[in-house]
């Protein structure tokens, strides 16, 4: 899942996708870009969100570290602090990794809040409507 609400938002998303393709793996599908209101905080800046499906041979934690590196390169300064969200140039979240379930301090798969966030589920359901959530056992389109 990708999101941005600062700067040239479309450019930020396209740059993130290009860097993901260069370092993580082949982007096999990319959703449309969705304009959405901020979630979890107030801002005058609307978000642009998208979902991408990437084929990779890398393990989940390597994907996480590479996407965090890409965020920093594009201009992300920090993730939420103490659960407080803020404006960001780019946010890249690893939502799913096949049907893998992972619960570590650094990474939880599937993303524990994805099904509660329409700005995540709408683009994800566009590119993978019949993909089944490995814990909830429902298709992405059913979770919308």
Task: Label every PLM stretch briefly.
Residues 6-9, 13, 23, 41, ...:
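Hydrophobic alpha-helical segments and helix-packing faces
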Residues 39-46, 61-144:
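Flexible, gly/pro- and Lys/Arg-enriched active-site loops
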Residues 4, 52-58, 96-98:
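Short beta-strand-to-loop capping motifs
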Residues 1-24, 31-37:
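N-terminal beta1-alpha1 ligand-phosphate binding loop
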Residues 2, 30, 50-52, 92-94:
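A structural signal for short, well-ordered beta-strand segments
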Residues 28-30, 105:
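Beta-strand scaffold of nucleotide-dependent catalytic cores
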Residues 31-57:
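Short, charge-patterned binding micro-sites
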């Amino acid at each position: 899942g990708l999101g941005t609400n600062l700067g040239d938002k479309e450019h930020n998303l396209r740059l993130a996708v290009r860097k993901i393709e260069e370092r993580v793996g082949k982007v096999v599908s990319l959703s449309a870009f969705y304009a959405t209101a901020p979630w979890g905080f107030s801002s005058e800046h609307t978000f642009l969100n998208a979902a991408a499906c990437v084929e990779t041979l890398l393990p989940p934690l390597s994907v996480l570290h590479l996407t965090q590196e890409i965020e920093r390169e594009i201009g992300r300064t920090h993730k939420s602090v103490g659960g407080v969200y803020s404006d960001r140039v780019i946010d890249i979240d690893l939502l799913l990794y096949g049907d893998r379930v992972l619960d570590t301090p650094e990474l939880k798969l599937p993303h524990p809040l994805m099904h509660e966030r329409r700005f995540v589920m709408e683009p994800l359901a566009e590119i993978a409507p019949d993909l089944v959530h490995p814990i909830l056992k429902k298709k992405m389109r059913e979770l919308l």
